[in-house]
Design a protein with these regions (language model features):
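Alpha-helical membrane-inserting segments
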Residues: 24-28, 54, 58, 101, ...
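Hydrophobic alpha-helical segments of integral membrane proteins
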Residues: 1, 8, 65, 69, ...
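Helix-loop-helix units of permease transmembrane domains in multi-pass membrane transporters
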Residues: 60-92
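Transmembrane helix-loop junction
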Residues: 26-30, 63, 72, 107, ...
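Transmembrane helix segments
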Residues: 25-32, 141-183, 187
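Transmembrane helix-boundary elements of multi-pass transport/secretion proteins
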Residues: 2-67, 95, 115-122, 172, ...
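Alpha-helical transmembrane segments and their short interhelical loops
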Residues: 80-154, 200-211, 216-219
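Juxtamembrane loop-helix boundary motifs flanking transmembrane segments in multi-pass membrane proteins
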Residues: 3, 76, 80-84, 111-115, ...
Length: 234
């Protein structure tokens, strides 16, 4: 966390795009409509969760792997759990920082409304939907070098947002996006967020899709980690 804070652009960048999207698109176009403003805020929260975790874990892990102390740290008898727990705590802190401007803009500049129960539900769902993007970031970080990790994260970033329906209101995306989105991690995640903050129905296919992505990405991340271990210590 201290290392991340020493690079202000990494912290500021994670919060900039979701907040900028709120100010550029949500506030002027749907800010006065309570329903659409609430759904749009949920979409931007999903956007922030995806982008923060893709870059925090994808690029962060890849950069850590090339540091001279990394082989020594990974050989310590404490094992990988303390380091992974620290990385998770750091990642959640950065994710919370990136979400804060979105929530403040929604509160101060739009008509978005949430009951206390819906707010708590949205918080829980936010942590749940972060899991596939954390695993995706780890898979990237343990698979490729830092420069390639930046490229891979950038290549995945916008297509996942667009194809997942994060750029439109519920039901407002082109037909092919509406058909594809529930089966993508972004589309499944945002549908759970919409259900948490509004009257959007809970879709079983989105839940099953999210579980499937967690299993698949978890397997890929574990494989990439073990492959990296084998290369370093075999």
């Amino acid at each position: 966390m201290i290392e991340t804070a020493r690079t202000p652009i990494a912290v500021i960048g994670s919060a900039f795009w979701p907040a900028a999207s709120m100010l550029a698109f949500v506030v002027p176009f749907v800010g006065s409509d309570p329903v659409y403003a609430t759904y749009a805020t949920a979409s931007m929260i999903t956007f922030a969760v995806m982008s923060t975790n893709l870059f925090q874990y994808g690029v962060g892990v890849a950069e850590d792997r090339v540091q001279p102390w990394e082989p020594y740290v990974r050989s310590l008898p404490t094992g990988a759990l303390p380091r992974f727990a620290g990385r998770l705590l750091s990642g959640f802190a950065l994710m919370a920082f990136s979400l804060l401007p979105v929530v403040l803009i929604a509160w101060l500049c739009t008509a978005a409304t949430l009951s206390p129960l819906s707010f708590l539900t949205a918080v829980v769902v936010t942590f749940i939907i972060s899991v596939p993007f954390i695993l995706m970031g780890l898979a990237i970080g343990y698979s490729v070098p830092p420069k390639a990790a930046v490229v891979v994260a950038q290549v995945l970033f916008f297509p996942l947002a667009f194809a997942g329906g994060l750029m439109t209101a519920p039901g407002g995306a082109p037909g092919f996006v509406e058909d594809l989105a529930p089966y993508l991690p972004t589309g499944a995640s945002v549908r759970l967020m919409w259900a948490a903050v509004g009257d959007y129905p809970v879709e079983i296919r989105s839940i099953l899709s999210l579980i499937a992505w967690i299993v698949v990405l978890g397997g890929v991340a574990l494989w990439a980690y073990r492959r990296d271990e084998g290369r370093r210590f075999s």
